[in-house]
Amino acid sequence: NNVETYANVPKIILQGADWFRTIGTEGSPGTKTFSLTGSIENTGLIEVPMGTTLRHIIYDIGGGLKSGAAFKGVQIGGPSGGCLILDQLDAPLDFDSVKKLDAIMGSGGLVVMDENTCMVEVARFFMNFTQRESCGKCVPCREGTKRMLEILERIVDGKGEMSDLDELEELANMVQNMALCGLGKSAPLPVISTLKRFRDEYEEHIRDKKCRAKVCTALRQFHINPEFCIGCGKCAKNCPAGAISGKIKHLSLIHISEPTRLLSIS
């Protein structure tokens, strides 16, 4: 059990189980503490009755997204949690409802994401965490998460293939069904949920070598705008990859190649 479980015990002892069941839902009585974070105005720890909707938490308690940004998704349940989308904001947050959405209540993490978030990178980030946290006892978790992470890293580096998506799904199902413990069984959820709800972003990374959120640096391409180039030559002089050529008072050109794509230039 965790601290949240123990915190409920004194009140149940003092006021009884019947009182406790007046809060929340029939299948998930009581309250739940969430850590509200991400692209949201009001962050912090909140305690709400089980069955409260994500919409109420994000917009009424959290104050909506920062600077009026467009909502893209919310990751629920901690590092092994699933990602939900706009159509699922009215789903009640209780154990049964969340499980049906390929997510978990988990540690109560709620990470709100806007349109500037790359969902492929989100999956890679959390898979990196769960892979490092694997105890290594069972092969499905130890090797399965490692292989999934390798594929995700290849995709965000612009080296993915369409067949990788089928392999990711197969590995995710294998780890989920064959891992020995709860961490291993839930580890693939970020990948399963993002593949299901943001598959187009995966395909863009692979097919078009494009990250719509401009987060994956390996997929950034740089161009010189002829309307603003004055032919000063400073860009060519300062380019660490030596990928810019041109004469003074003439338009400079960027030679698109692997080194150029890897530069973290805004």
Provide a role label for each language-model segment:
Residues I254-I265:
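Single conserved hydrophobic/aromatic residue that forms the stacking wall/gate
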Residues N1-M50, G62:
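Hydrophobic alpha-helical positions that pack around
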Residues K66-F95, K196:
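Terminal amphipathic helices with adjacent charged low-complexity linkers/tails
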Residues N1, T25-S28, G38-I40, K66-G68, ...:
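Solvent-exposed alpha-helices and their adjacent loops that cap or buttress functional pockets
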Residues N238-C239, S264-S266:
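Cysteine-centered loop/knuckle micro-motif
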Residues P92-P226, G242-S252:
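Ferredoxin-type iron-sulfur electron-transfer modules in oxidoreductases and energy-metabolism complexes
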Residues G51-K66:
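Short amphipathic, charge-patterned alpha-helical segments
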Residues G231-N238:
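C-type cytochrome heme c attachment motif
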